[in-house]
Amino acid sequence: MGIFAQDVVADNMLLFQRDNGGWPKHYLNKKINYTTIFSEAEKATIKDEENRNDATIDNEATTKEIRYLLNIYKKLGTQKYFKAAEKGIDYLLTAQYKNGGWPQFYPDLSSYRHLITYNDNAMINALNVLQDIVEHKNDFDIVNPKYTEKATLAVQ
């Protein structure tokens, strides 16, 4: 196990992660299926989109990936999964508005995307991730302790 242990779903999550730390909810206008075995050409196309502004918390995007990556890191010990999960946590903390809400998409705040998102449990899912950091539970006991104070402030 360790550095060379791999998980197809986790590797695909890393492939889709945006530079800002979040994840999109769609690929080719469909919900991302992380169990897909992508060709090298498809992987290159997906990787070329890593700087897009389409990261979101809608439809469990970003929060689902953070949770999965921490869980698989605990099982396999593969550091890249842990780093990607923490980058996702950074995304949640950065995207949060001062009033406590989150836009549906970040950093793309055009159109309705800047509005605080209550549908699909988007905000609840983000808050639950941060609360799990505060309480050190559901695999969040392993994240860097620096996140505890930030998450505490974010959920107040």
Positions of PLM-derived features:
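Non-membrane alpha-helical segments in proteins
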Residues: 23-25, 31, 60-74, 87-88
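Well-ordered alpha-helical scaffold segments within catalytic/enzyme domains
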Residues: 1, 9, 14, 63-78, ...
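Solvent-exposed loop and edge beta-strand segments that line ligand/cofactor-binding
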Residues: 47-61, 110-123
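Short amphipathic alpha-helical molecular recognition features
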Residues: 2, 57, 73, 77-80, ...
